[in-house]
């Protein structure tokens, strides 16, 4: 498919060819949900921890004799029914991450890209560079009407541009390798540079070598 290349000044810089296999596929909401759940699970620190009966401080002596007191039998003041007792089946330090097949992750990214294109929220820009001041970048994005935007560049991002965007709320700049389903869906506008489009094609297996073999 053909799409117009925009500039940050809201001008035109020609057209770009986007492969239908990446940007015009049928979005799979179930696959995107699986990938997002996987991403969020992997992001969890897993440092939650409570103390059990064997970890809380206190005596291990039986509080009183088994019979004859009129009270319910007790074996330890560390039991969970007491105020200073340990927790039962509480959270422990662990890794919440799990494996997700590479094909599922790839299909999730393609679905997210196609979803943005179908919604008319996909923009191809000529470059994401030459901007050093946050004030200047904010003015350009405001003129474009981008309140929430994810900008995907090529193999690396321009340091000055990334620094200028760092203080802007709901604006993120990522290299191609960092493009992911969660951030794409979490932003209103997805802006990809020309270099980013080529890098995405290579990352998803639709690079120049495959195009030559198909021809």
Swiss-Prot record:
GO terms for molecular function: rRNA binding; structural constituent of ribosome. Keywords: Ribonucleoprotein, Ribosomal protein, RNA-binding, rRNA-binding. GO terms for cellular component: ribonucleoprotein complex; ribosome. It comes from the Bacteria. Residues 51-88 are annotated as: Disordered. InterPro entries: Ribosomal_uL4, Ribosomal_uL4-like, Ribosomal_uL4_dom_sf. One of its GO terms (biological process) is translation. One of the primary rRNA binding proteins, this protein initially binds near the 5'-end of the 23S rRNA. It is important during the early stages of 50S assembly. It makes multiple contacts with different domains of the 23S rRNA in the assembled 50S subunit and ribosome. Forms part of the polypeptide exit tunnel. Belongs to the universal ribosomal protein uL4 family. Part of the 50S ribosomal subunit. This is Large ribosomal subunit protein uL4. The lineage of its organism: Bacteria, Pseudomonadati, Pseudomonadota, Alphaproteobacteria, Acetobacterales.
């Amino acid at each position: 498919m053909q799409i117009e290349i925009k500039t940050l000044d809201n001008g035109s810089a020609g057209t770009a060819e986007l492969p239908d296999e990446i940007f015009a596929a049928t979005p799979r909401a179930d696959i995107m949900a699986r990938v997002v759940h996987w991403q969020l699970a992997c992001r969890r620190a897993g440092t939650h921890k409570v103390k059990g009966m064997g970890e809380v401080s206190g005596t291990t002596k039986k509080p009183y004799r088994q019979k004859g007191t009129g009270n319910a039998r007790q074996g330890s003041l560390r039991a969970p029914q007491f105020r200073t007792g340990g927790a039962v089946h509480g959270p422990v330090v662990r890794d919440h991450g799990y494996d997700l097949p590479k094909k599922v992750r790839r299909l999730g990214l393609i679905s997210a890209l196609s979803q943005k294109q179908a919604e008319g929220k996909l923009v191809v820009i000529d470059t994401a560079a030459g901007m050093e001041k946050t004030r200047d970048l904010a003015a350009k994005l405001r003129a474009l009407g981008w309140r929430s935007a994810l900008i995907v560049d090529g193999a690396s991002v321009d340091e000055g541009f990334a620094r200028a965007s760092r203080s802007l709320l709901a604006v993120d700049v990522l290299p191609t390798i960092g493009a992911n389903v969660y951030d794409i869906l979490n932003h209103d506008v997805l802006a990809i540079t020309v270099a980013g489009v080529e890098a995405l094609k290579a990352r998803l297996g639709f690079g120049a070598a495959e195009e030559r073999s198909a021809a």
